[in-house]
Regions:
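Arginine/glycine-rich "motif VI" loop of SF2 helicases in the C-terminal RecA-like domain
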Residues: 71-76
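Catalytic cores and conserved motifs of cyclic dinucleotide signaling enzymes
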Residues: 55-58, 78-80
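Intrinsically disordered, glycine/charged-rich C-terminal tails and inter-domain linkers
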Residues: 77-117
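Short glycine- and acidic-residue-rich catalytic loops of nucleotidyl-transferase/cyclase enzymes
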Residues: 1-3
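Alpha-helical scaffold within the catalytic cores of cyclic-nucleotide enzymes
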Residues: 5-44, 48-50, 62-69
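Short, surface-exposed, charged loop/turn segments at secondary-structure junctions
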Residues: 58-62, 94-96
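Short, solvent-exposed loop/turn segments at secondary-structure junctions
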Residues: 8-9, 51-55, 89-90
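Generic structural signal for isolated residues within well-ordered alpha-helices
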Residues: 69-70, 89
């Protein structure tokens, strides 16, 4: 069972912040009395670039496609993966760590994002 959410942000740092906050909150939820025996997890993919808006609720573009692939097919529970463009835009941040990843099926570079210790 899976649900997808697409959210647009003015810059990629905000998208990363929200993804990491979702992971934190789900970890708290999973330790609460409301949690089931199966943990609730989030897999996130983040891209950065121009999108083509098609009506009020749909957008398309290369980075949207890459982010979707990363979030839906590659990321594991509580993992945020970002494209090269996201990495390049926010690489100077000291509060997060980027780990370059390899995947045989993908033709584009991507990174795993975690909070710095």
């Amino acid at each position: 069972f899976a649900d997808d959410i697409v959210a647009l942000f003015p810059e990629p740092g905000s998208a990363i912040d929200v993804a990491l906050e979702i992971h934190r909150r789900l970890q708290l939820f999973n330790t609460s009395p409301l949690a089931s025996e199966h943990p609730t997890l989030c897999c996130a993919g983040v891209g950065y670039g121009h999108v083509l808006a098609i009506g009020p609720n749909l957008a398309q573009g290369d980075e949207m496609n890459r982010a979707s692939k990363l979030g839906e097919d590659i990321a594991r529970g509580n993992e945020t993966l970002v494209t090269q463009r996201v990495h390049d835009a926010v690489a100077a941040r000291e509060d997060i760590v980027f780990e370059r990843q390899d995947h045989d099926d993908l033709l584009f570079p991507f990174y795993r994002v975690t909070e710095a210790e």
